[in-house]
Amino acid sequence: MFELLEGWEWKEVADALKGFQVVAAMITISELGDLTRFKHPRQLMGFLGLVPSEDSTGTRRRQGAITKCGNSHARWLLIESAQAYRNTPKVSAKLSKRQEGQSGAVKALSWRAQDRLSGRYRRLKLRGKRENKVIVAVARELCAFIWELHQLMGDDLPASTQTHRNP
């Protein structure tokens, strides 16, 4: 499988983020397909079921558990990948090696994601939120960073992956 990945156009995207390595990226991208169909990261979050359900009536608004609609494999992988952000942000030797040869914009996005997601994890835990709820919240934001990384890399990807790209 790793031999097939050498020529894969998404390899750079897969190597950019902490906790989101090649196999997870390959499965997620194959499950989600073309990310250009989502005009905003909130649409991708909703597609994956990482948004809260809502029960509203009149002036009362109640948000519940995540909707769990969409692809359960991709949602599960994002939740598993989000566990890497429990630790303090740092560029490890492994991550640094994976990021060799990548553009400065990709590395900056990776660091911004690491810093924000680790901070979000710590803040939610300090507020007394349960571990699973915190990890799902981090996975939801990780989803947005994956969408942004796809937008950033979109011009460099082959035309076959840009079939629905909107200007």
Q: What spans do the regions from the language model cover?
A:
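A detector of single, family-specific signature residues
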Residues: 1-167
